[in-house]
Amino acid sequence: MLFELERVTIERDSKVVLQDVTASLPKGASCVAGPSGSGKSTLLRLLNRLADPLSGVVRYEGADVRERDPLELRREVCLVPQLPALLEGTVEENIRFAADLAGREPDVTRLLDLAGLGSSFASRYSGKLSVGEQQRAMLARALALEPRVLLLDEPTSALDEEARGAVEATLLHLRERVKVSTVLVTHDLAQARRMADWVVRLDEGRVVAQGPVKEQLAV
């Protein structure tokens, strides 16, 4: 398994967000699904130590994530947040910023292509992009780190139907071209069926089901 959570509990503002969660996420395309407030985004942040549990263990490729340097882990297991958080400046400058953190010289044109953006977007200013374009620029910036895992926190929740379809198509196409596992957070079970092979379902901070999407989310 790529990730394993064993009896994980975490609190925020003295409120239990996840309670006694035991779950597994394999390599490939996984998702964490559930209603708003079920703890999905918190679980995602445990995977690269943007949050640490109150109790229990989170393992990445069999090793406790607390044994890893947090910054190194976050370059390898990269979060694309729900709301775009681009730096001021051009898309290329955003990509180069991430690549510099990883000590790499980025192929900007290729990264834009992987993210479903044309080369002309390199010189576009982040503040002039639509929300859907910002989301794909965030993806290009994340890919500049050459991560092994992408954590996708509700990447289409703020998009209209057309933009949502474009981002989904980009992610599906990306998996065919790059060896990267994805963990998608979504409240939309139809999206989970389209985008993932494995699902962990949460409700009120507890796991209520997990396994292959075809079994757990059968129509």
Question: How would you describe each model-predicted region?
Answer:
Residues 105-121:
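Conserved ABC ATPase "signature" region
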Residues 150-154:
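Catalytic Walker B motif of ABC-type/P-loop ATPase nucleotide-binding domains
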Residues 125-129, 133:
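Conserved ABC ATPase signature
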Residues 161-163:
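Helix N-cap at the start of a conserved alpha-helix in ABC-type nucleotide-binding domains
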Residues 56-64, 73:
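Conserved ABC transporter NBD signature motif
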Residues 48:
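Helix-to-loop junction immediately C-terminal to a conserved catalytic motif
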